[in-house]
């Protein structure tokens, strides 16, 4: 490997200072330029974008909203719920998403997929991924260093990337919005944890593309929640701390809100800490209890774990309002019914180290923002896990008795903010949103490797984005014609302790003694937090650039296209399945309506002749038997069978109605008074 280092050896002190001043001014101008370009890009988007929906793609639940008729509408799904489980399942006949998938998980564990957000943008050998796999009933395999989900679909084994599963959930949210708005939707703002790295952000964008969405902006979840909190807040400047503890991720962001300007001062967090981890602790506790009490190891029994997971999640939720619950599971294993108490105190004891772990990012965010505890005006709670009383108490104690704000719905705040940002970008937000300005930050320092494996930062963490920064480096060896630019993100001083984002070679450097060539490296982070790196030989005028998108784990354009095609096939299959179910329901409904008509002696039944009645009962009985024997018939078969039944029943019912109307007219005639 060839390292490069800064060319400062031959500078005099005065020249160095002059150069530093010049570069600082230049850097400032470049930042202004980047912001202006971003502004122009947004104006361009406003002209061509349709309605832009806001989607909170959560680990455990997802939510969709839209800025509509001068306010944000959080949209209920087809089950009437405003949040949808981030679950996908495959049965022998169909694909299920949301509640339908989660509700059948216990009897179909190996083909029910959840938590794709904990895998997205990560490598297979990531310790967090390996830790999660032991709790997952479905199979996660290594494909090109990435975690892929292996599941049986219609008899054959298929591999799905986390992006594809996430795309299925996004498709469900898109369809939910389309049903509400009555039109097709293409454009969306999608939220990600503030501490998501470059690879995870890009993978989320890819998931949007697979779902057929144009992801116009990726915004950070705490920033979305801050918008929800501060949209209607008038008056002077205030500092707010957003504490976002969700199902699988944790973020802390500190923002200044001042009349519609939302400026992020700092952000910190843990992309692998949330409610699921609390569930896992409780599951571990009961797995050990079962082993001790019944001498049975259920840790590899996927059905038992599925039942236990569901009940542990319910128990956790109940303990936010009660001090004790009983975890009861019918036939947990070998016909044994499980029933054990769980107290709030035990739950807190099992998770105390995790609760305490959330306080470290709070301290870090305050330090990075240069603020004291007393400088925070409001604490905003986001994410379902913030309902846990111990979490609220620890936060209150840390802030010397300050009560967190309860004004925002922790499940919906992020989608609400994303919908507002969608209204800003589309122009549909009108006057209410025209003064909103988001100034977000890069969550991690970005830099390159220089001599000795040193991390040289180009963009420090918490730099306002979009941004563009450059530094000049030089060669390390005489006559060097190629340098390798290794790009990293992280806060450690050595690159081996940070995360490699990618690398590329700059070739065609004019041969010269070491220290002579001038190589300018430019880092540009867009409004989505995605990085592009460019290296240019200032003398030879040769340059090379790459968009850093986790070049080892990123889906290729071809893979994305293939996944889009597969997603369209699934959508077509879903449509066919829905039409089939609708046709079956239509036939069933007709048959049962006719049965009750024939049986109802108080109404029409007594007016149907015995011969017609026998004919109708015969065809209805035959139709019900046919339905039992043809569970997986095609839509056309159900339609054909309905026509057969209607052919017998409709003329009889029509004739009875006509006869009844005639009798009513005769009766009416008799009742008229004489003039």
Swiss-Prot record:
Subcellular location: Endoplasmic reticulum lumen; Nucleus
Entry protein name: Heat shock 70 kDa protein BIP3
Disruption phenotype: Bip1, bip2 and bip3 triple mutation is pollen lethal. Bip1, bip2 and bip3 triple mutation affects female gametophyte development during the early stages.
Annotated signal sequence range: 1-35
Primary site of residence: endoplasmic reticulum
Complex formation: Interacts with BZIP28 (via C-terminus). Interacts with ERDJ3A.
InterPro entries: ATPase_NBD, BIP_NBD, Heat_shock_70_CS, HSP70_C_sf, HSP70_peptide-bd_sf, Hsp_70_fam
Domain of life of the source: Eukaryota
Biased composition regions of type Acidic residues, renumbered to the chain: 663-675
GO BP: pollen tube growth; response to singlet oxygen
Described function: In cooperation with other chaperones, Hsp70s are key components that facilitate folding of de novo synthesized proteins, assist translocation of precursor proteins into organelles, and are responsible for degradation of damaged protein under stress conditions. Required for pollen development and pollen tube growth. May be required for the early stages of female gametophyte development, but not for polar nuclei fusion during female gametophyte. Possesses ATPase activity in vitro.
Membrane listed as a keyword: no
Motif Prevents secretion from ER boundaries: 673-675
Annotated SUPFAM superfamilies: Actin-like ATPase domain, Heat shock protein 70kD (HSP70), C-terminal subdomain, Heat shock protein 70kD (HSP70), peptide-binding domain
Gene Ontology terms for molecular function: ATP binding; ATP-dependent protein folding chaperone
Tissue expr: Expressed in mature pollen grains, and pollen tubes.
Entry similarity comment: Belongs to the heat shock protein 70 (TC 1.A.33) family. DnaK subfamily.
Disordered as annotated region, ranges: 656-675
A GO CC term assigned to this protein in UniProt: endoplasmic reticulum lumen
Activation and inhibition: Binding to ERDJ3A activates the ATPase activity of BIP3.
Organism the protein comes from: Arabidopsis thaliana
UniProt cross-references to Gene3D superfamilies, sorted A to Z: 1.20.1270.10, 3.30.420.40, Actin, Chain A, domain 4, Substrate Binding Domain Of DNAk, Chain A, domain 1
Pfam families (UniProt xref): HSP70
């Amino acid at each position: 490997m060839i390292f490069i280092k800064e060319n400062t050896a031959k500078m005099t002190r005065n020249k160095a200072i002059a150069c530093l001043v010049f570069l600082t001014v230049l850097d400032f101008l470049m930042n202004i330029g980047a912001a202006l370009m971003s502004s122009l890009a947004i104006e361009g988007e406003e002209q061509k974008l349709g309605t832009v929906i806001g989607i909170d793609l959560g680990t455990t639940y997802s939510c969709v909203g839209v800025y509509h008729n001068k306010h944000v509408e959080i949209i209920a799904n087809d089950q009437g719920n405003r949040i949808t489980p981030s679950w996908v399942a495959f049965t022998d006949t169909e694909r299920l998403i949301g509640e339908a998938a989660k509700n059948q998980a216990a009897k179909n564990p190996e083909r029910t997929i959840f938590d794709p957000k904990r895998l997205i943008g990560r490598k297979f050998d990531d310790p967090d991924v390996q830790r999660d796999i032991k709790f997952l009933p479905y199979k996660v395999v290594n494909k090109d260093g990435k975690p892929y989900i292996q599941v049986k679909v219609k008899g054959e084994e298929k591999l799905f990337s986390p992006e594809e599963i996430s795309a299925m959930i996004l498709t469900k949210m898109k369809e939910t919005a389309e049903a509400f708005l009555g039109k097709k939707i293409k454009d969306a703002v999608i939220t990600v944890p503030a501490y998501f790295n470059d690879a995870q952000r890009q993978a989320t964008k890819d998931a949007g593309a697979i779902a057929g969405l144009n992801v116009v902006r990726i915004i950070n979840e705490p920033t979305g929640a801050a918008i929800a909190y501060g949209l209607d807040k008038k008056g002077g400047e205030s500092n707010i701390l957003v504490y976002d503890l969700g199902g699988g991720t944790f973020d802390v962001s500190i923002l200044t809100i001042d009349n519609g300007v939302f400026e992020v001062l700092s952000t910190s967090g843990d992309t692998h800490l949330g409610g699921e981890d609390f569930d896992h602790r409780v599951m571990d506790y009961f797995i050990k209890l079962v082993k001790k009490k019944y001498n049975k190891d259920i840790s590899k029994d996927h059905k038992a774990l599925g039942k236990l997971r569901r009940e542990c999640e319910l128990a956790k939720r109940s303990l936010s309002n009660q001090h004790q619950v009983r975890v009861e599971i019918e036939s947990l294993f070998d016909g044994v019914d499980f029933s054990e108490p769980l107290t709030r105190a035990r739950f807190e004891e099992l998770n105390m180290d995790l609760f305490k772990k959330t306080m470290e990012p709070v301290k870090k965010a305050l330090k990075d923002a240069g603020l004291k505890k007393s400088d925070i005006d409001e604490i905003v709670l986001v994410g379902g896990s913030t309902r846990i009383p111990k979490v609220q108490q620890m936060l209150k104690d840390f802030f010397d008795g300050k009560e967190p704000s309860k004004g925002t719905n922790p499940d919906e705040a992020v989608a609400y903010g994303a919908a507002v940002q969608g209204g800003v970008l589309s122009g549909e937000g009108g006057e209410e949103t025209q003064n909103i300005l988001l100034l977000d930050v890069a969550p991690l320092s970005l830099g390159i490797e220089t001599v000795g494996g040193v991390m040289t930062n180009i963009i420090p963490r918490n730099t306002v984005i979009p941004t563009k920064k450059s530094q000049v480096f030089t060669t390390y060896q005489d006559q060097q014609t190629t340098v390798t630019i290794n790009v990293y993100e992280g806060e450690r001083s050595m690159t081996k302790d940070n995360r490699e984002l990618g690398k590329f070679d700059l070739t065609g450097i004019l041969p010269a003694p070491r220290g002579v060539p001038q190589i300018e490296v430019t880092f540009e982070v867009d409004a989505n937090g995605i990085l592009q790196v460019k290296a240019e030989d200032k003398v030879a005028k040769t340059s090379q650039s790459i968009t850093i998108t986790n070049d080892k784990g990123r889906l290729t354009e071809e893979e994305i296209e293939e996944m889009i095609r597969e997603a369209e096939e699934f959508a077509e299959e879903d449509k066919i399945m829905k039409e089939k179910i609708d046709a079956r329901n239509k036939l069933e409904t007709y048959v049962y309506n006719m049965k009750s008509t024939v049986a109802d002696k108080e109404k029409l039944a007594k007016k149907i002749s015995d011969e017609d009645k026998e004919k109708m009962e015969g065809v209805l009985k035959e139709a019900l038997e046919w339905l039992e024997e043809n569970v997986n018939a095609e839509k056309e078969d159900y339609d054909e069978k309905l026509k057969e039944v209607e052919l017998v029943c409709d003329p009889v019912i029509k004739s009875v109605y006509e006869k009844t109307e005639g009798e009513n007219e005769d009766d009416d005639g008799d009742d008229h008074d004489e003039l």
